[in-house]
């Protein structure tokens, strides 16, 4: 996907023709109606109590900006277009009567639970008799080249 398009200006007194108006508006409108976005997911991750586990995302529902690969670095969502992003991450844990369930979203961690920077950590008490759901949505200023990974 191309970077956020620059807007075109018109000079005072310049005649606005259909072709100039289309050239000035089509690319920005196309960008706004199809922004960069990605929905990658995973199923059946095995976790060890007390250990942060990198979550590998083995499937995609959509990816409009080549932000995820199921073959290389499948745990990463890589930003290719700088801008504001609405980032949601979610996990469902099986029923259990003890402890807490944790999700940690990290920036540029390189696959390490202690690498890079923590953007969000969520701790939720386990629910006995029902699944425990952990979710968070954040608005982030993202820079092209950065990557995000989730640990559970």
Predicted feature locations:
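Terminal (often C-terminal
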Residues: 4-102, 107-112, 117-125
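Extended, compositionally biased low-complexity polar/Lys-Gly-rich tracts
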Residues: 6-9, 135-137, 142-144
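Intrinsically disordered, low-complexity regions of eukaryotic proteins
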Residues: 65-67, 141, 148-151
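Surface-exposed coil/turn segments at beta-strand junctions on protein surfaces, enriched
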Residues: 78-82, 129-131, 141-143
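Extracellular beta-strand-rich recognition modules
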Residues: 83-93, 134-136, 146-152
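Short, surface-exposed coil-to-beta transition loops
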Residues: 99-100, 132-136
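Short, surface-exposed linear segments at secondary-structure transitions and domain or protein termini
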Residues: 124-134
């Amino acid at each position: 996907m191309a970077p956020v398009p620059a807007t075109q200006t018109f000079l005072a007194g310049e005649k606005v023709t259909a072709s100039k108006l289309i050239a000035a508006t089509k690319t920005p409108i196309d960008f706004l109606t199809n922004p960069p976005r990605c929905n990658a997911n995973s199923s059946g991750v095995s976790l060890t109590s007390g250990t942060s586990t990198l979550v590998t995302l083995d499937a995609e529902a959509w990816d409009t900006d080549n932000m995820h690969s199921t073959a290389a670095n499948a745990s990463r969502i890589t930003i290719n277009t700088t801008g504001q992003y609405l980032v949601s991450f979610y996990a469902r844990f099986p029923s259990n009567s003890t402890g807490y369930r944790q999700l940690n979203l990290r920036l540029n961690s390189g696959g390490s639970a202690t690498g890079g920077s923590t953007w969000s950590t969520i701790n939720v008490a386990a629910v006995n008799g029902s699944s425990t759901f952990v979710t968070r949505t954040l608005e982030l200023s993202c820079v092209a080249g950065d990557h995000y990974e989730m640990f559970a």
